[in-house]
A protein has these predicted regions:
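Walker A/P-loop phosphate-binding motif and the immediately C-terminal alpha-helix
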Residues: 4-42
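Residue-level preference for the first positions of well-ordered beta-strands
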Residues: 8-10, 36-38, 114-116, 147-149, ...
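P-loop NTP-binding site
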Residues: 12, 221, 225, 235, ...
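N-terminal phosphate/diphosphate-binding loop that engages ATP/GTP or pyrophosphate donors
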Residues: 31-111
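Active-site loop/turn elements of alpha/beta-hydrolase fold enzymes
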Residues: 42, 119, 232
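Cytosolic-facing regulatory segments adjacent to core modules
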Residues: 89-152
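Conserved catalytic-core segment of NTP-binding enzymes
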Residues: 128-232, 237-238
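C-terminal boundary of histidine-terminating zinc-finger modules
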Residues: 242-252
Length: 273
């Protein structure tokens, strides 16, 4: 039984914590374990984003927001919380769920059963805010037994726009910095406010057992659930420095353990419902 199928998992955290790297590794590991995976790059400020981490190709897919009419049609959820619609329809998209077959190939990058979408990027000065991209991240729910990973912008602004309303799990990536723990605590509280306890922290860039213990204790004091740890990985660090795709790395084994633990936690939750 694939516990994570039909789940939407949002990944957030402090800037520089390694969100996109972790999302790319989670996506590849889920694919390896037989899942059909959708990756949503919802970070308008990261020019390379997930595409750079997953592909050696030069040209990224077209912005997904254009399929829905661009920012001329898609509104910011803070100003207009109503559901998104298709470009030639006024019917709320949550009433007629998206089928992948209706989206032209130019809007996606595919690798076997993994499909990546870039919602949109800020490319020019004064072109406007990225609020409409947040609505796409909130409402883009695909028909079928996919697991969807949503890589949002750094910080917590996405909570203000309500992106988390349509997700099943929130994962917050925490690196060894004080600010990262502050954000993790806020994320846990805001997720709880929305009525969900399915929020867990993944410790990243852990370079020693001593640091890992300090980080775990800090999570405990702040009442943030711990899911797993990823050690500092030179291969990931080098790929980030050179702007290249992440190849094989030691972190993959840790990622597999994190996915297994998440499956077990959600399976236990289902048994108690």
């Amino acid at each position: 039984m694939k516990i994570l199928k039909n789940k939407r998992i949002l990944v957030c955290g402090k800037g520089g914590s390694g969100k996109s790297s972790v999302v790319s590794l989670l996506g590849k590991s889920l694919l390896k374990n037989g899942y059909r995976v959708i990756l949503l790059d919802a970070d308008a400020s990261n020019p390379g984003g997930l595409f750079r981490l997953l592909s050696t190709k030069i040209n990224a897919p077209k912005p997904l927001i254009e399929f829905f009419g661009g920012r001329e049609k898609v509104t910011c959820p803070s100003d207009d919380p109503s559901p998104m619609t298709r470009i030639n329809s006024n019917l709320p998209i949550n009433e007629t769920v998206i089928d992948l077959s209706e989206i032209p190939e130019k809007y996606s990058f595919k690798k076997k059963d993994l499909t990546l979408f870039q919602i949109g990027k800020i490319k020019e000065a004064c072109e406007g805010c990225d609020g409409p991209m947040s609505k796409v991240a909130r409402d883009f729910i695909v028909k079928g037994d996919f697991v969807t990973l949503i890589d949002v912008e750094a910080g917590i602004e996405h909570f203000g726009r309500g992106v988390e309303k349509n997700v099943d799990v929130v994962l917050v990536i925490v690196d060894p910095t004080f600010e990262s723990f502050v954000i993790a605590e806020i994320v846990a509280k805001m997720t709880s406010y929305l009525g969900s306890n399915n929020v867990w922290a993944i410790l990243n860039k852990v370079d020693s057992k001593e640091i890992e213990l300090i980080m775990q204790n800090s999570l405990k004091k702040r009442e943030v659930n711990y899911l797993g740890s990823i050690n500092f990985d030179k291969e990931i660090h080098k790929a980030g420095l050179e702007g290249k795709m992440i190849a094989q790395c030691k972190a993959e084994k840790k990622i597999e353990g994190i996915i297994k633990k998440l499956e077990n936690l959600l399976e236990t939750e289902m048994e108690y419902k």
